[in-house]
Amino acid sequence: MERTFIMIKPDAIKRRLISRIIQRFEEKGLYLAASKCVIPKREVLETHYSHLSSMPFFSEMVEDMMSGMVLAMVWVGKDAVSIGRKLIGETNPQAASVGTIRGDYGVSTGKNIIHGSDCVENAEKEIKLWIGDDVQPVSFFDKEWIY
């Protein structure tokens, strides 16, 4: 089974959207394998978003992400990365389809509620960065029913 990294950002936590977001992943048949609530450190954010470091909004984004808790999660299931991306929607909530997390709850590109890995390789890097190596294997007792 494939793993993906999903992070609920401070704007969603401040708006009390955690349960609504988690419900969408569970309803799609993904399993929550690990989670961690943390106020992110600058170093972790700079590593996570290193591909955006030359962008003019980078410093403001890092400061905003440090403004409150994030919920870092590992979700497991068949095609977990692509399912996660479809559930999340476009980066810009204004362009995201209604029915996606960002389309329904996002306010702006800077307040877009959630992060999701874009490929399996990045998912594994992000899981290691945010959660570490302590993710236990998931028992799929209902695998045949879901898949």
UniProtKB/Swiss-Prot annotation:
GO molecular function: ATP binding; metal ion binding; nucleoside diphosphate kinase activity
Catalysed transformations (reactions): a 2'-deoxyribonucleoside 5'-diphosphate + ATP = a 2'-deoxyribonucleoside 5'-triphosphate + ADP; a ribonucleoside 5'-diphosphate + ATP = a ribonucleoside 5'-triphosphate + ADP
Uppermost EC category: transferase
InterPro entries, sorted: NDK-like_dom, NDK-like_dom_sf, Nucleoside_diP_kinase
Catalytic residues identified in the record: 115
One BP annotation, GO: CTP biosynthetic process
Task performed by this protein: Major role in the synthesis of nucleoside triphosphates other than ATP. The ATP gamma phosphate is transferred to the NDP beta phosphate via a ping-pong mechanism, using a phosphorylated active-site intermediate.
Keyword terms, alphabetized: ATP-binding, Kinase, Magnesium, Metal-binding, Nucleotide metabolism, Nucleotide-binding, Transferase
Pfam families: NDK (PF00334)
Designated name of the protein: Nucleoside diphosphate kinase
Domain of life assignment: Eukaryota
Cofactor(s) the protein requires to work: Mg(2+)
EC number(s) from the headed UniProt entry: 2.7.4.6
Binding locations of ATP: 9, 85, 91, 102, 112
